[in-house]
């Protein structure tokens, strides 16, 4: 039996204020329940109504055709994402509203109104056309977190080109793999980007990648740093020179709802990265609606999601979701602690940010740096907080709620994936009570099921299993680019007929889902299956601990031994006494079964460039393997792994 034992008890419940609830889009549990039941009973009627809030050049014949794994949404409908994100607003009072508020790491500011952005996007769409880009061609975008990244994405969608954004922190090798797989015709990059006061050599990386990736005919370079960069005449072009020569009118290409919108690569733990393909109509409709309801967006909001556009969160909730809603979206180029650990809070106060969406890994860093930094700032503009990227442990949730939100801002703890396109499980901030550590309830139209290894539903609220989705939803991935077999193998083979997320979860008596981490991060200790996230949450609840990552290593007696890698808060030092204290603390919080066999103190944990802990590498280190295997292109700092290996 493939069931997870859940041993973390978290009973605290928090409620949105009456004032928040009264003004929210969805105001009560009853309203949520009524709409949710309708969305499941009549998905065609429900999603047809939502999609009709957007502009379609031609109406659809059928809202939903077919079932998992190959549903089609809004069949026969024609639309254009850039038209809906820009032209729709430019025809209203929003033309002069700020669309993007940008701050560079060195401190410069730019504000683009909807009218400004509309003109820039059309100009760059014409640039792409002049470089020979046609509908269906792939364009790779390798840029820092600057407005040109959003402009390039929207310009691709305007002419029906398929964008593939590659995070600016990736190496030349990772970039080359992604260009080759997509067979991109044009690469858009910059002379460099700023990060922690240094310069990221994007153009040099691009040149290196193109020695290996030969499909690219043209490279467009944004002048960001002013650094001297190598140049290939005929192939390389300055962004500003091409833009000066381009007209600012470009009619949007009417796109079939199921035509490709973008490819985004997600790392497999082995083998080459997977190119997740999203399509136009369903993705647009779903990110529009989730942004509106999950973040309770109003016209006067200043919304800031701290993700980079190189990740799905940046696609859906920095660029497309906010702009489809006519919102003001904040973009920041640099690190959260540059030049000091209060950079984020400075930005919140400076621009009057009202909705703030960030990752648990960032929140744990803020905790480590101490309450003094946010304490220097008012933060009184904030009305709603969100988290994304991994489960948030209750301790970090409570810190976020009290220290950043001052106890007055609801928190939406959102579960979703690159593959799902948009938020799948969350609380709706005016409708639901919040439970720290629980993501919440399914969004409209989402039908989750927790299954055991025999494909049977897990009914016991204290038991976890595999988190699956049993019905199609509009923004789901349609395939893995160029590899339909891998698509079926990866997502639909484990539990036939349903989408398997790869995550473990449990559902409590109130229908709230708690995400227990990746199923391949499950420990099997003396016949008990334990989720690593619960043990990590117990460790982080100790006052000395900043972050923890728990993995298993083979053990001849227990099957797996529990190894915890722990970083400490400032003011605490590693010692054998502290190791014993932490082991006893976990045993007390969870039970003796979860007591770590080994605790290793470290100054940092190996993370991806989006801040997720790479437990796969820690498993190899814990097992004493000298050679690190598998794809490490997303690893942010290789020296962390080397130091951990030396300390082993």
Swiss-Prot record:
EC category name: ligase
Binding residues for CoA: 195-198, 313, 337
CDD domains: ACS (cd05966)
EC number: 6.2.1.1
Gene3D superfamilies assigned: 3.30.300.30, N-terminal domain of ligase-like
Binding site for ATP: 389-391, 413-418, 503, 518, 529
Modified residues (N6-acetyllysine): 612
GO CC entries: cytosol
Record-level Gene Ontology MF annotations: acetate-CoA ligase activity; AMP binding; ATP binding; metal ion binding
Cleaved signal peptide residues: none
One of the protein's GO biological processes: acetyl-CoA biosynthetic process from acetate
Domain of life: Bacteria
Entries under InterPro entries matching the protein: Ac_CoA_lig, ACAS_N, AMP-bd_C, AMP-bd_C_sf, AMP-binding_CS, AMP-dep_synth/lig_dom, ANL_N_sf
Catalysed reaction equations from the record: acetate + ATP + CoA = acetyl-CoA + AMP + diphosphate
Family: Belongs to the ATP-dependent AMP-binding enzyme family.
Protein name per Swiss-Prot or TrEMBL: Acetyl-coenzyme A synthetase
Gene source species: Thermus thermophilus (strain ATCC 27634 / DSM 579 / HB8)
Lineage: Bacteria, Thermotogati, Deinococcota, Deinococci, Thermales
């Amino acid at each position: 039996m493939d069931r997870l034992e859940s041993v973390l008890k978290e009973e605290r419940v928090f409620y949105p204020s009456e004032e928040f609830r009264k003004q929210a889009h969805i105001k009560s549990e009853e309203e949520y329940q009524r709409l949710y039941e309708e969305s499941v009973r009549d998905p065609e009627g429900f999603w047809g109504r939502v999609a009709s809030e957007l502009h379609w050049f031609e109406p659809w014949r059928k809202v939903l055709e077919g079932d998992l794994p190959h549903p089609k949404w809004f069949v026969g409908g024609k639309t254009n994402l850039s038209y809906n994100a820009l032209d729709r607003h430019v025809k209203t009072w929003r033309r002069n509203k700020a669309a993007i508020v940008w701050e560079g790491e060195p401190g410069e500011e730019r504000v683009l109104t909807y009218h400004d952005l509309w003109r820039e996007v059309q100009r760059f769409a014409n640039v792409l056309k002049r470089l020979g880009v046609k509908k269906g061609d792939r364009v790779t975008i390798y840029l820092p977190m600057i407005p040109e990244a959003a402009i390039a994405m929207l310009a691709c969608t305007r002419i029906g080109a398929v964008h593939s954004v590659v995070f600016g922190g990736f190496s030349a090798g990772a970039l080359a793999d992604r260009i080759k797989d997509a067979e991109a015709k044009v690469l858009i990059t910059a002379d460099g980007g700023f990060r922690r006061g240094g310069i990221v050599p994007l153009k040099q990386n691009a040149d290196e990648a193109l020695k290996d990736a030969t499909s690219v005919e043209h490279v467009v370079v944004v002048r960001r740093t002013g650094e001297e960069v190598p140049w290939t005449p005929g192939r390389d072009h300055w962004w500003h020179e091409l833009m000066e020569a381009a007209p600012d009118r470009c009619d949007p290409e009417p796109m079939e709802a199921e035509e490709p919108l973008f490819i985004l690569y997600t790392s497999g733990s082995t083998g080459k990265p997977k190119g997740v393909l999203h399509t136009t109509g369903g993705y647009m409709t779903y990110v529009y609606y989730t942004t509106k309801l999950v973040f309770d967006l109003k016209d006067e909001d200043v919304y800031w999601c701290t993700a980079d556009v190189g990740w799905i969160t940046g696609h859906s909730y920095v660029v497309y979701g906010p702009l489809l809603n006519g919102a003001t979206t904040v973009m920041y180029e640099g690190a959260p602690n540059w030049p000091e650990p209060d950079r984020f809070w400075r930005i919140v106060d400076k621009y009057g940010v009202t909705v703030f969406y960030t990752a648990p890994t960032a929140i744990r860093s803020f905790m480590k740096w101490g309450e003094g930094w946010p304490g220097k700032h008012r933060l009184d503009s904030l009305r709603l907080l969100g988290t994304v990227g991994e489960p948030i442990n209750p301790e970090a949730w409570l810190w976020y709620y009290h220290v950043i939100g001052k106890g007055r801002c609801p928190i939406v703890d959102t579960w979703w994936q690159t593959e799902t396109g948009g938020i799948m499980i969350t609380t709706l901030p005016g409708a639901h009570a919040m439970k720290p550590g629980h993501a919440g309830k399914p969004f409209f139209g989402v039908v989750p099921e927790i299954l055991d290894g025999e494909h049977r539903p897990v009914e016991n609220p204290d038991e976890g299993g595999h988190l699956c989705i049993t019905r199609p939803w509009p923004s789901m991935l349609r395939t893995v680019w160029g590899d339909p077999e891998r698509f079926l193998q990866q997502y639909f083979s484990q539990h036939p007929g349903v989408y398997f997320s790869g995550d473990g979860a449990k559902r409590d008596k109130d229908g709230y889902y708690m995400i227990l981490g990746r199923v391949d991060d499950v420990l099997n200790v003396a016949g008990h299956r334990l989720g690593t996230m619960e043990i990590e949450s117990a460790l982080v609840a100790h006052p000395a601990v900043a972050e923890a990552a728990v993995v298993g290593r083979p053990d001849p007696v227990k099957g797996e031994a529990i190894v915890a890698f722990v970083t400490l808060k400032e003011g605490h030092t590693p010692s054998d006494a502290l190791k014993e204290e932490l082991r006893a603390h976990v045993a007390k919080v969870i039970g003796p079964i979860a007591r770590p066999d080994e605790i290793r103190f470290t100054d940092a944990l190996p993370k991806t460039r989006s801040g997720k802990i790479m437990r796969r590498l820690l498993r190899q280190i814990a097992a004493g393997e000298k050679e690190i295997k598998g794809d490490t292109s997303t690893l942010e700092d290789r020296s962390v792994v080397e130091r951990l290996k030396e300390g082993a």
